Amino acid sequence: MRLFLSLPVLVVVLAMVLEGPAPAQAAPEISRTFERIPDKLKEFGNTLEDKAREVLETIKQSDIPAKTRNWFSETYNKVKEQLKTAFS
């Protein structure tokens, strides 16, 4: 039953895709596209910057860096003590 329903839907979707864009959806002039590239790149850069700042602030506010630093310090001190006792 599912196959009978999915095949016509698949055929309709495939026909729409192969038909191509409608005339109203045709690509604008290439010069307009090139004119908008710097604006799009600036917008992309701004959103990327904002997201990176949010991530960094989240990391700074969390206690993960402090816990990681403490764990490395403790592990380093343990290894150092073990080496001292082993080679003494």
Swiss-Prot record:
The gene name reads APOC1
Stored Pfam families: ApoC-I (PF04691)
Q: Which GO terms describe its molecular function?
A: fatty acid binding; phospholipase inhibitor activity
Q: Which UniProt keywords apply?
A: Lipid transport, Secreted, Signal, Transport, VLDL
One of the protein's GO biological processes: very-low-density lipoprotein particle clearance
**UniProt main location, coarse:** secreted
Specify the species. Answer: Ailurus fulgens
Compartment(s): Secreted
Role according to the record:
Inhibitor of lipoprotein binding to the low density lipoprotein (LDL) receptor, LDL receptor-related protein, and very low density lipoprotein (VLDL) receptor. Associates with high density lipoproteins (HDL) and the triacylglycerol-rich lipoproteins in the plasma and makes up about 10% of the protein of the VLDL and 2% of that of HDL. Appears to interfere directly with fatty acid uptake and is also the major plasma inhibitor of cholesteryl ester transfer protein (CETP). Binds free fatty acids and reduces their intracellular esterification.
Q: Which residues constitute the signal peptide according to the record?
A: 1-26
Q: Which domain of life is it from?
A: Eukaryota
For this chain, the family text in UniProt reads: Belongs to the apolipoprotein C1 family.
GO CC terms: high-density lipoprotein particle; very-low-density lipoprotein particle
Q: What is this protein called?
A: Apolipoprotein C-I
InterPro entries to which the protein is assigned, alphabetical: ApoC-1_sf, ApoC-I
